[in-house]
């Protein structure tokens, strides 16, 4: 009977994409996917260290599986991703039953590392590594939409964030390799790609070449133009954008290119300039608002989402109010919110002016209340409208319904048969509008692109 594997993924879209690649490697080695973790011979945890609670959850899982390994020595335990990169050998001292600790840059080398483990070694792979172009096809979770990494790592030095230390410096993939991957996805029947990067609009800064006009030869804007005409791909999304690199040229391209969905995820983190400076974000409140104004000048109905942190060290009530004011001024369609969580080896974690937990929790609740109200109000504009929805799957709560997303990334439910509608762009009249999702009725199958 072949070995079976199970992957538990924490955190961001980058981790989800890495997990798909590692699943592809495991299946190429002859392993099969297990239905449950306790049925697996190889357990892989792809980890996130942005928040402390995800890290604590990991160690809880590892403690349980370490006990299982004492009963079954053939069980292979792997910790991959950002916690693995951050902890390295220390993780083995804490949980000696772990067989392999590997940073995110080693996702494409899982096979050779696993062979070392099966030959009797306990392996730690966290040294800096140049990116390796995908050599094994990922086992993708969807047959309709796909992640495509375009840039790895991060050169920013935000004072609260561990990402540069665990994912390394920016490394952009060559445009030709990116297009080739997208062409292969189109040939397999995929309809939508999401281009991924920690700061995706910083793409190309590390690639050589200057144009006759004196600008960099490779920019994210140029990449969008380069891949846009791949036949069969109907929609192009991207995440995550950094305000520092979000230019008007990029905004114009998004407005001009019909396949590029009019949804933009641009974290702002705080609405106060002093806090932004302490965070080392590299932009001001005014700069952020100018970006949003420019997007809406070119694309009035564009959907905007973002990330925000409350309770950053030193944040006063007045500074928090500026965050609330910015949220109200922008009118976000969705906002990922979090209370500041001190992370190891970051400057902000050592500062003495930490905000008490009770105040952070109060501010988070107040912000979430405002976000839900604004999202609910903005959602009403969809009522009665026709939207084109790319159907992805079955509503897990109602087998008579399918779900998909609009151009603006609104989750939308509609009646229908998944075997008929999966991967189809369906014109839908919206009949219900909730804060973060819609419901509607199909009018006709559509071959329109977004």
From Swiss-Prot:
Cofactor note text: Binds 2 [4Fe-4S] clusters. One cluster is coordinated with 3 cysteines and an exchangeable S-adenosyl-L-methionine.
Domain Radical SAM core: 140-377
UniProt xrefs under Gene3D superfamilies: Methylthiotransferase, N-terminal domain (3.40.50.12160), tm_1862 like domain (3.80.30.20)
GO molecular function: 4 iron, 4 sulfur cluster binding; metal ion binding; methylthiotransferase activity
Subcellular location: Cytoplasm
Cofactor needs: [4Fe-4S] cluster
A Pfam entry, by short name: UPF0004
Reactions that this protein is recorded to catalyse: N(6)-dimethylallyladenosine(37) in tRNA + (sulfur carrier)-SH + AH2 + 2 S-adenosyl-L-methionine = 2-methylsulfanyl-N(6)-dimethylallyladenosine(37) in tRNA + (sulfur carrier)-H + 5'-deoxyadenosine + L-methionine + A + S-adenosyl-L-homocysteine + 2 H(+)
One BP term from GO: tRNA methylthiolation
Top-tier EC class: transferase
Residues binding [4Fe-4S] cluster 1: 12, 48, 82
Keyword set includes Iron-sulfur: yes
Major localization listed first in the record, in broad terms: cytoplasm
Record: residues binding [4Fe-4S] cluster 2: 154, 158, 161
Coiled-coil annotated residue ranges, if any: none
Domain of life: Bacteria
Domain TRAM span(s) in chain numbering: 380-444
GO cellular component: cytoplasm
Enzyme Commission identifier(s): 2.8.4.3
Listed InterPro entries: Elp3/MiaA/NifB-like_rSAM, Methylthiotransferase, Methylthiotransferase_CS, Methylthiotransferase_N, Methylthiotransferase_N_sf, MiaB_methiolase, rSAM, rSAM_horseshoe
Record note on quaternary structure: Monomer.
HAMAP family given in the database record: tRNA_metthiotr_MiaB
Physiological role: Catalyzes the methylthiolation of N6-(dimethylallyl)adenosine (i(6)A), leading to the formation of 2-methylthio-N6-(dimethylallyl)adenosine (ms(2)i(6)A) at position 37 in tRNAs that read codons beginning with uridine.
Family: Belongs to the methylthiotransferase family. MiaB subfamily.
Name used for this protein in its record: tRNA-2-methylthio-N(6)-dimethylallyladenosine synthase
Species whose genome carries this gene: Thermosynechococcus vestitus (strain NIES-2133 / IAM M-273 / BP-1)
